[in-house]
């Protein structure tokens, strides 16, 4: 940068700060001019001054590039949901990290499957009831959403979750859908009418899908967290044979091992010895005057406990 350009930039910044100090910058009162200038610069510039910069920019992207924006939103939320649920449930991978292999898979599902499908279905739903604002039309829209749109989305979701979980055959996928379908539908039927009624009342149609994704993020994180906790508890029961208190069982096993070692070790000064030290009974006594082999500090305890 040349000296002339440097002075020009400094002058522009000083002028912007002075403008903000007098409250001339839209949305500012002059109390914190430097913060106002910085905040305006990073939230869209002067043309967006006085508006909610990030939200305005996001809604603008929803209008100009709806599918791309929804794909990025759904992918980010799905990956974040898996990561947050893993952290809450203390579900780590073999390297001890919460960023498991499911995180990028869930992000891919959200961006490439969930978002395009939801975009298409919500578009059809909105087209069916376009320019129909009566209470009857709104109730009918909620019914169509719950009886047609939700079953399609939930079925695709369960198929994707089965594949991500490692299902290899169509029968395994069918079993996953059969077991989980009505459970997921019950959650949808409880939350969807409220969310759709809220969207009908307060949100522009372009913002419906991101709003539904945000609600699904919180509900999905909770369900994912509960599922992970149950799976970890089942693994502990299988591994330790003692419900969710596997760590305590591990401690009790070690304590019993130490007690067994103390009772099994021959006391010093008793039994056959050489030089006041107990002789390893498996080696017998030594009459040849050679060095005494080291004692066996930990006698055999049979099979190791299951850890």
Swiss-Prot record:
Residue stretches of biased makeup (Basic and acidic residues): 241-264
Segments of skewed composition (Low complexity): 266-278
Positions of region (Disordered): 241-307
Reported phenotype of the disruption mutant: Impairs the recruitment of hex-1 assemblies to the matrix face of the peroxisome membrane, and the subsequent production of Woronin bodies.
Cellular localisation: Peroxisome membrane; Cell septum
GO CC annotation terms, alphabetical: cell septum; cytoplasm; peroxisomal membrane; Woronin body
Stored InterPro entries: Mpv17_PMP22
Any matching Pfam family: Mpv17_PMP22
Resulting phenotype, residue 102 to W: Leads to total defect in the production of asymmetrical nascent Woronin bodies and localizes uniformly in the peroxisome membrane
Keyword Transmembrane found: yes
Membrane topology of this protein: Multi-pass membrane protein
Main location: membrane
Domain of life: Eukaryota
Alphabetical keyword list: Membrane, Peroxisome, Transmembrane, Transmembrane helix
Ranges annotated as spanning the membrane: 106-125, 146-167, 207-227
Family (UniProt): Belongs to the peroxisomal membrane protein PXMP2/4 family.
Self-association state and partner proteins as the record states: Self-assembles into detergent-resistant oligomers and forms a complex with hex-1 assemblies.
Function (record text): Woronin sorting complex protein involved in both Woronin bodies (WB) formation and inherence. Localizes to large peroxisome membranes where it self-assembles into detergent-resistant oligomers that envelop hex-1 assemblies, producing asymmetrical nascent WBs. These structures are then delivered to the cell cortex, which permits partitioning of the nascent WB and WB inheritance.
PANTHER family cross-referenced by the UniProt entry: INTEGRAL MEMBRANE PROTEIN 25D9-6 (PTHR11266:SF93), PEROXISOMAL MEMBRANE PROTEIN 2, PXMP2 MPV17 (PTHR11266)
Name the record gives this protein: Woronin sorting complex protein
Organism, as annotated: Neurospora crassa (strain ATCC 24698 / 74-OR23-1A / CBS 708.71 / DSM 1257 / FGSC 987)
Protein's gene: wsc
């Amino acid at each position: 940068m040349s000296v002339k350009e440097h002075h020009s930039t400094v002058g522009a910044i000083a002028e912007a700060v002075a403008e903000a100090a007098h409250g001339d910058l839209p949305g500012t009162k002059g109390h914190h001019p430097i913060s106002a200038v910085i905040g305006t610069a990073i939230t869209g510039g002067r043309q967006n001054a006085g508006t909610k910069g990030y939200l305005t920019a996001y809604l603008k992207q929803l209008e100009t590039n709806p599918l791309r924006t929804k794909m990025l939103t759904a992918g980010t939320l799905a990956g974040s949901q898996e990561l947050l649920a893993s952290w809450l449930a203390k579900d780590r991978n073999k390297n001890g990290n919460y960023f498991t292999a499911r995180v990028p898979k869930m992000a891919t599902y959200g961006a490439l499957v969930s978002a395009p499908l939801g975009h298409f279905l919500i578009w059809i739903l909105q087209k069916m009831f376009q320019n129909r604002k009566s209470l009857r039309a709104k109730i009918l829209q909620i019914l169509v959403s719950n009886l047609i749109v939700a079953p399609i989305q939930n079925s695709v979701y369960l198929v994707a979750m089965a594949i991500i979980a490692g299902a290899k055959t169509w029968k395994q996928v069918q079993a996953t859908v059969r077991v989980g379908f009505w459970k997921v539908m019950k959650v949808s039927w409880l939350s969807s009418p409220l969310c759709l009624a809220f969207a009908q009342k307060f949100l522009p149609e372009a913002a419906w899908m991101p709003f539904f994704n945000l609600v699904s993020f919180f509900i999905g994180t909770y369900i994912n967290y509960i599922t992970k906790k149950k799976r970890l508890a089942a693994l502990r029961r299988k591994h330790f044979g003692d419900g969710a208190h596997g760590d305590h069982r591990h401690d009790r096993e070690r304590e019993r091992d130490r007690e067994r070692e103390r009772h099994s070790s021959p006391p010093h000064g008793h039994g056959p010895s050489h030089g006041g030290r107990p002789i390893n009974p498996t080696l017998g006594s030594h009459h040849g005057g050679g060095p005494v082999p080291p004692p066996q500090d930990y006698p055999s305890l049979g099979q190791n406990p299951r850890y």
